[in-house]
């Protein structure tokens, strides 16, 4: 509802009314503000106070729109006339009230009466215009500015407005379809006597000369306002005419207010007022719309205001009680805290004194304990020394008495009882130490000998017990003996004896199993230049299984486990692994290639399948890589000799075979080969890479760079110098045309040139592979030796330069051959080809043949040459061809007209062919060739213009004269104009 949403503005209006000249709230509801001690009650107090002030100021009704006009007279007997118009909105319904008041003051008496009250209700829900107007006009009554006592508190704030007098008692008013007008005329006369200032409602005329007719009024209290509303309801007259029935509520149900309504952050003034007035609004809804009656709302708001005031008083009283309780609690808390602080300080002093006493006693106790422990240690040492001396004296005396009594000796139980052998070992170790200290005393010589004898026999007895326990897998007994021997003399013999007695090192069946596996060559697979041998995987898997089992036993038995594991690993490499590798390699002793591959595979397999897994055991004191190198040292020492011998035999046999085959080729026979034999070149590359890979593994560190250089130089020698150079020279000789031969097969020569191009292409490809090999397989492994690195680089580029020089020679020879073929193709050119009279727009037969030949040369070069080599070659071909054409056309007479057009047709075709070469030099040369045709096309007087304006300026005068003389209409006088 819109009037409920304006509750905040009504609170501000109430604050303004409390200023001087406005309406002050009743003094009975004013309570001093206190600082709340309870957050719950404080939160409730704020909304209740706001609602109380709002209801006091406006009764819950929104700010009305009031138009008032006052007519005052300076003479006391004159009456005051006031017309008040008030507009109120409830939701979408608008209420408009118009009231005519008149009053007259005389002395201490005040006469006031209400003339006419018009109520207009406007609602969008009304379907038809309904209006009533009822009025009672008193012609003797005069307007007054004083309000009627029956008016609501809202209506007391009126200003004067013009009145509308009607002479008829019953007047019907027709309004808009959404407006209902009800005019109620009441006449009320109120007499107020102002005798004392304490009167509840006092109207006193002003004595000011400027405004004597105005009367100052004071707001009534809440009780007086309630009484006025009740009187107004009782005095309400029956309307004279009412077209729409209005039903008033029988009883206003007061809403009980509690503090729970105002709890929480979601409380809203608007929602509260809407809930408060919803029942009244529903009751006033008739069949034809809403009929507003303000009296029930005023009564409801007054009751609510009283309840809110009472609730506010209760909350304030509760706040005061809580504040007092908090103050009392704070006082008690501080008093108890002071008492506890004093008690704590007293207790702290007692504990401090107690701690000091405990520290003093503890220090003394520790001192006494140290002294007692020192005395006890000295006592134990003295007793031990005394016991050792007694045992030593016993051994010394027993030895002497045995000699005197014929070998009859009597010893202590510790020397004779076998169950105390471990205790005896501890005693003998101490006796041996004492014997060393007193060896210079001659009286204890016999005791020292007896101690040594007992020590030897004792160690042998413990070793025998250990071996018997190992045979029956009694790990507890083994551990007891090993621990005793470790404390007796370190236990090295015990660990060594255990390793020697392992089944894998002396059992005949184990030896035969390893030997049979090494001789089983069916498990070896050869894949190209690589081998896959599963024998090593089977063998090393079995070893790792045995090592894992023995490690478990060693951890459970021996104290010094690292030493025992080191002995086990060393024995494995020195005996079992070495024997297996020797058996495998002995089968390949007659085949150098397989021997080298097997050695390399065995080395890598041993490292990968055995050394690397054993690294995970973390055995201290054993260098596994050194053990690996010790096994393969005998093969590494003579590796490079075997490698070079194998490579030389392989390279030599292939090169000799290929060279012998090429020697049988005829000069002009057809060739099916495409350059170098790819099988041979790839064999060189693959075998060299394999050899370099083997050298990384099988070469000793100090000679690795030299071995790589040896292998690389060997490959360069056979691949470049002995094979590639030989093949290149062989194919360079083929395209040469003998001068004595008058009939040469052009197709055969073209094929030989094509073969040369393919050889050049093959050489370029193999050179690229060798350069990649150098970067990947050679250079990274020789960087530690700058001398070897420099030697390898120089040798590589020397061989490449030699090949390039030879290739350049071959390409120059091929160009010469091509030009010779072009000249040979131009020979059939007829002398009258350019003296014809009929023009058919076709090239000559010779021109077509030459173009076809040059195009074939260009295609061969494009397929087989690459990069700058191709561009330089075709550019040279184009320039040489243009030179041949220049000399060729110097020999022919050119007819003017049709003959010149025929010449231009041939020259245009030559020029178009030259565009493929994509060379500016070639384009300029053929442009010059085409310009020659203009000398035959223009008139003689234009020779100078043609020569100076085109490419002919680059041609010598002698050549120009030659071409001019070839005109069919040549006259010598033309030469004077040049």
From Swiss-Prot:
Region (Disordered), start-end ranges: 1-87, 122-246
Keyword Coiled coil: yes
Record's keyword annotation contains Membrane: no
Coiled coil: 303-325
Compositional bias (Low complexity): 36-52, 62-86, 143-245
A cellular component annotation (GO) from this entry: exocyst
Biological processes annotated in GO: exocytosis; Golgi to plasma membrane transport; protein transport
One Pfam assignment: Sec10_N
Bias type Polar residues, positions: 1-11, 122-142
Keyword terms of this UniProt record: Coiled coil, Exocytosis, Protein transport, Transport
Domain of life, per lineage: Eukaryota
Oligomeric form and interacting partners: The exocyst complex is composed of sec3/exoc1, sec5/exoc2, sec6/exoc3, sec8/exoc4, sec10/exoc5, sec15/exoc6, exo70/exoc7 and exo84/exoc8.
PANTHER family named in the record: EXOCYST COMPLEX COMPONENT 5, SEC10
Family note: Belongs to the SEC10 family.
Protein name from the UniProt record: Exocyst complex component 5
Organism: Dictyostelium discoideum (Social amoeba)
Gene this protein is translated from: exoc5
